[in-house]
C-alpha cells in the first residue's frame, strides 16, 4: 500500500557475510554503477527486545532491497505492532485496521534519490505467513521488495496491467534472492 506524502541470531535470517564486491549487476545506473541504498531501521514502541531479535537485521534488509532499487534510494524501514500499524493505516488511508506494509513515498530528490519509509506491521506479517504457508523470512523479503517497488512508483492498484508488471518484478527479484514465487 502506497501513501504519498548486529549479528543475526535467528538462522532463518542468516546471510552471506561477503560484500558482493566484484559481482556483476543488471541494475547499474546510467553512470555504470549499482544504485546506492541509504538504509535506516527503526522499531516501534510495541516491538520489544525479544521480538527485535527475531526480525531481519539491517544487513539482511539491505541485501533484500538492493536488487529492488533502480536508482539511488534513502529508505527507513520501521517495524511496528498492531496499534501503530492500525493508527498509521487509519490516518493515511482511512482504513481502520493494520495492514502488512505501508509505503510512504516522498518522491525523488533533485539529485535523483528516491526517499521513502516502509512500515511493516509484525503481527500482520506473522499471521499472513502462517495462513499462507510461507516462511516468515520469505514473507518479510517479499513485503520489503513490494514496498520498495511502491516507493519507485509501481502500483498494483492502478489496474491489471500494472499489477502484472509489479508482480513479475517481485517474482524475478525474489528468485534472484533465492525465494519462491510469493503468489503461488
Curated annotation (Swiss-Prot):
One MF annotation (Gene Ontology) recorded for this entry: RNA endonuclease activity
Coiled-coil segments on the chain, per record: none
Regions of compositional bias (Acidic residues) in chain numbering: 1-11, 19-29
UniProt-annotated binding residues for Zn(2+): 146, 150, 156
InterPro entries to which the protein is assigned, alphabetical: MetalPrtase_cat_dom_sf_prd, YbeY, YbeY_CS
Entry note: cofactor: Binds 1 zinc ion.
Subcellular location field: Cytoplasm
Top-level taxonomic group: Bacteria
Principal subcellular localization: cytoplasm
GO biological process terms on file: rRNA processing
Region annotated Disordered, chain positions: 1-38
Alphabetical list of Gene3D superfamilies matching this protein: Metalloproteases ('zincins'), catalytic domain (3.40.390.30)
Keyword Signal: no
CC annotations in GO: cytoplasm
Keyword Zinc among UniProt keywords: yes
Cofactor field: Zn(2+)
UniProtKB keywords: Cytoplasm, Endonuclease, Hydrolase, Metal-binding, Nuclease, Ribosome biogenesis, rRNA processing, Zinc
EC number from the UniProt entry: 3.1.-.-
Enzyme superclass (EC): hydrolase
Pfam families (UniProt xref): YbeY (PF02130)
Function: Single strand-specific metallo-endoribonuclease involved in late-stage 70S ribosome quality control and in maturation of the 3' terminus of the 16S rRNA.
Family stated for the protein in its record: Belongs to the endoribonuclease YbeY family.
UniProt protein name: Endoribonuclease YbeY
Upper taxonomic lineage: Bacteria, Pseudomonadati, Pseudomonadota, Betaproteobacteria, Burkholderiales
Gene for this chain: ybeY
Amino acid at each position: 500500500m502506497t501513501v504519498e506524502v548486529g549479528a543475526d541470531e535467528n538462522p532463518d535470517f542468516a546471510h552471506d557475510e561477503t560484500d558482493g564486491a566484484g559481482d556483476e549487476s543488471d541494475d547499474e545506473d546510467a553512470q555504470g554503477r549499482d544504485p546506492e541504498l541509504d538504509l535506516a531501521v527503526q522499531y516501534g514502541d510495541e516491538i520489544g527486545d525479544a521480538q527485535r531479535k527475531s526480525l531481519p537485521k539491517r544487513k539482511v534488509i539491505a541485501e533484500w532491497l538492493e536488487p529492488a532499487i533502480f536508482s539511488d534510494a534513502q529508505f527507513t524501514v520501521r517495524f511496528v505492532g498492531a496499534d501503530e500499524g492500525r493508527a498509521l493505516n487509519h490516518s493515511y488511508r482511512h482504513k481502520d485496521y493494520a495492514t502488512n506494509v505501508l509505503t510512504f513515498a516522498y518522491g525523488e530528490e533533485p539529485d535523483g534519490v528516491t526517499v521513502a519509509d516502509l512500515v511493516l506491521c509484525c503481527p500482520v506479517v506473522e499471521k499472513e505467513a502462517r495462513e499462507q504457508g510461507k516462511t516468515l523470512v520469505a514473507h518479510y523479503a517479499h513485503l520489503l521488495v513490494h514496498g520498495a517497488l511502491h516507493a519507485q512508483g509501481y502500483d498494483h492498484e492502478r489496474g491489471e496491467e500494472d499489477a502484472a508488471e509489479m508482480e513479475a518484478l517481485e517474482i524475478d527479484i525474489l528468485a534472484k534472492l533465492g525465494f519462491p514465487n510469493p503468489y503461488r
